[in-house]
Regions:
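Conserved alpha/beta-hydrolase "acid-adjacent" motif
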Residues: 248-254
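Conserved alpha/beta-hydrolase catalytic His-Asp/Glu region
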Residues: 163-164, 180-233
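Active-site loop/oxyanion-hole signature of alpha/beta-hydrolase fold enzymes
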Residues: 83-129
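Catalytic active-site module of serine/aspartate enzymes centered on a nucleophile-bearing elbow/loop
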Residues: 264-292
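Conserved HGGG/HGGXW glycine-rich cap/lid loop of the alpha/beta-hydrolase fold
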Residues: 10, 37-94
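Short beta-strand/loop motif that positions the catalytic acidic residue
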Residues: 235, 241-243
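Flexible "cap/lid" loop of the alpha/beta hydrolase fold
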Residues: 139, 143-178
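An N-terminal hydrophobic leader/cap segment in hydrolases
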Residues: 1-30, 42
Length: 292
């Protein structure tokens, strides 16, 4: 097993460095959000165009920035983008002993509030873009009134986090570090069986090989106990769920159920999950946000 397959060595470059793109200025910071915890936040600001409202970007569980490079490389020349990496990712700096409770949706939600406070951003003025776990965190936060927005596009949200039986068994057990490479192999195998889109499969494999598996293990323990509230009537600003019928990992039926529960929620169907990571999706984003 190569060293990177336990999330420990030469994948660190995936979790640091501020990607620079034409037409924007970039900065990278580790923002304190909780005692002993800092999150990596990357910000792009257009150098020439007059930016519309700020986009705050919250990616999925363990998601690497590289998967979003095609979209952000284009989008950053016209919009100020604040890209937040949540605490289960390898990029988070954690200087305290951690437990399952440190990775609850409530904690992840509080982190977003702390980042907005750090940058003096008012949530009601934000256009949110999120994926998977990021979308779930936001739905929960919007519903309880912790966060709001000008608009929110929620790509492939999860109402709950279902793991295969064998994965549940591994998640609940205390695992020694030497087991981590085995877990990675099993996770890659499971994803490659489940995911049909080639681009999505490549992104997930790379992400799985790049994780801090202690963080991900504790995060999975917390998430497997979580589900969105049945009543999402607390959300009162424009939201859209974006998904693709080809995305078997997240599931169209689950996305449609969430749409039915969020008041006046719109549905944006895209050709593939990969499409939502590329620059072409900007036209769908603009249409929903009425920027075109």
């Amino acid at each position: 097993m190569a060293a990177e397959e336990d999330g420990s060595s030469n994948m660190d470059s995936d979790w640091s460095g501020a990607p620079s793109f034409p037409g924007s200025e970039v900065s990278e910071e580790w923002v304190p959000v909780d005692e002993g915890i800092k999150l990596r936040v990357i910000t792009w600001k257009p150098t020439s165009s007059k930016s519309a409202s700020t986009v705050v970007f919250v990616a999925g569980w363990g998601s690497l920035f590289e998967g979003w490079r095609p979209l952000i490389s284009e989008w950053s020349s016209e919009r100020t983008i604040v890209y937040i990496e949540t605490r289960e990712k390898k990029s988070s700096e954690i200087s305290k002993k951690i437990s399952e409770s440190d990775f609850s949706v409530d904690k992840l939600s509080s982190d977003l509030v702390a980042v907005l406070r750090f940058y003096e951003l008012e949530s009601t003025q934000i256009d949110w873009y999120s994926s998977s776990l990021g979308s779930t965190i936001l739905i929960d936060s919007f519903n309880c009134g912790r966060l709001s927005g000008r608009s929110s596009i929620l790509l492939a949200p999860n109402s709950e986090f279902k793991f295969p039986f064998w994965a549940k068994a591994l998640i609940v057990l205390p695992l020694p570090r030497f087991m981590y490479p085995i877990i990675v192999r099993l996770a890659v195998w499971a994803v490659e069986r489940k995911v049909k889109e080639e681009g999505q499969r490549i992104r997930y494999r790379r992400a799985l090989l790049s994780q801090d598996l202690q963080k991900m293990h504790l995060s999975a323990r917390s998430l497997m106990k979580y589900s969105l509230p049945d009543n999402l009537d607390g959300i009162s600003f424009p939201c859209a769920v974006m998904t693709a019928s080809s995305d078997k990992l997240h599931g169209m039926d689950r996305a449609m159920d969430i749409i039915d529960r969020i008041p006046n929620c719109k549905f944006i169907e895209v050709p593939s999950n990969q499409y939502a990571h590329e620059a072409d999706v900007i036209k769908e984003i603009h249409h929903f946000q009425l920027l075109e």
